[in-house]
Swiss-Prot record:
Designated name of the protein: Small ribosomal subunit protein uS17
GO terms assigned for molecular function: rRNA binding; structural constituent of ribosome
PANTHER family: 40S RIBOSOMAL PROTEIN S11 FAMILY MEMBER, 40S RIBOSOMAL PROTEIN S11-RELATED
Task performed by this protein: One of the primary rRNA binding proteins, it binds specifically to the 5'-end of 16S ribosomal RNA.
Record-level GO BP terms: translation
GO cellular component: a single term: cytosolic small ribosomal subunit
InterPro entries for this protein: NA-bd_OB-fold, Ribosomal_uS17, Ribosomal_uS17_arc/euk, Ribosomal_uS17_archaeal
Keywords tagged on the record: Ribonucleoprotein, Ribosomal protein, RNA-binding, rRNA-binding
Family: Belongs to the universal ribosomal protein uS17 family.
Signal peptide span: none
Pfam families found in the cross-reference section: Ribosomal_S17 (PF00366)
């Protein structure tokens, strides 16, 4: 995968520890050139079949003013998964916004919860 003792960057987000493994991925926020910016979200990884790409699902409540009740909603976000992170389907992950990596991928996984 990567060289032993490779440089690990501090991405500047509190509560996120850098991974112990290294990787050669250019789009890794810890070992590559990808910078994280914008919002930080939490969700459940529901699909991890494509190479280095997955889908994170977030459940949230939406207030309907007409009926004065909350309804459950969910959103699915396409994410890039660096190979240095050990995540699998069903894990709760922390994702951060970054520049567009692909047509529909603008978030990257930065850790497990």
């Amino acid at each position: 995968m990567g060289k032993k003792g490779a440089l690990v960057k501090n991405i500047g987000i509190e509560g996120v520890n850098p991974p112990s493994k290294t990787c050669d991925d250019i789009n890794c926020p810890f070992h590559g050139n990808l910078r994280v910016r914008g919002i930080i979200l939490e969700g459940r990884l529901i699909r991890y079949r494509a190479e280095k790409t997955g889908v994170v699902e977030r459940d949230y409540l939406f207030y309907d003013t007409k009926y004065k009740r909350y309804e459950r909603r969910r959103s699915r976000i396409h994410v890039h998964i660096p190979p240095c992170l050990d995540v699998k389907e069903g894990d709760n992950v922390i994702i951060a916004e970054c520049r567009p990596i692909a047509k529909s991928v603008s978030f990257v996984v930065i850790g497990k919860r």
